[in-house]
Amino acid sequence: MSGVKKFIPLLDRILVEKISNQATKTSGGIFIPTNKDAPTNNAKVIAVGTGSVKLDGSFIDPIVKEGDIVLINPKARSNTVPWGDKTYHLLSENDILGIIEN
């Protein structure tokens, strides 16, 4: 996808970039390392489609927005999208389990 400036997913599709596992800090200030090679289910939303279509033809707006940090279903089937020097994943909004707020 070299030369592409913007990618707009169709319908309920969401383009995400998975976030690598990092050490977590306890309330006491101790860092607990995580296995950086373990698969991560956290991702940043890069682009959002227009939403789902109801049976009557009207749209259901997407719940997530660009920039959200989300938890993805570990069994989600996604398409890998190489773009520039990064790899993104295209999945259905139904595969997002929740939005992570800090």
From Swiss-Prot:
It is found in: Mitochondrion matrix. Its main location: mitochondrion. SUPFAM superfamilies: GroES-like (SSF50129). GO terms for molecular function: ATP binding; metal ion binding; protein folding chaperone; protein-folding chaperone binding; unfolded protein binding. GO terms for biological process: chaperone cofactor-dependent protein refolding; protein folding. Belongs to the GroES chaperonin family. Homohexamer. This is 10 kDa heat shock protein, mitochondrial. It comes from Dictyostelium discoideum (Social amoeba). The lineage of its organism: Eukaryota, Amoebozoa, Evosea, Eumycetozoa, Dictyostelia. The gene is hspe1.
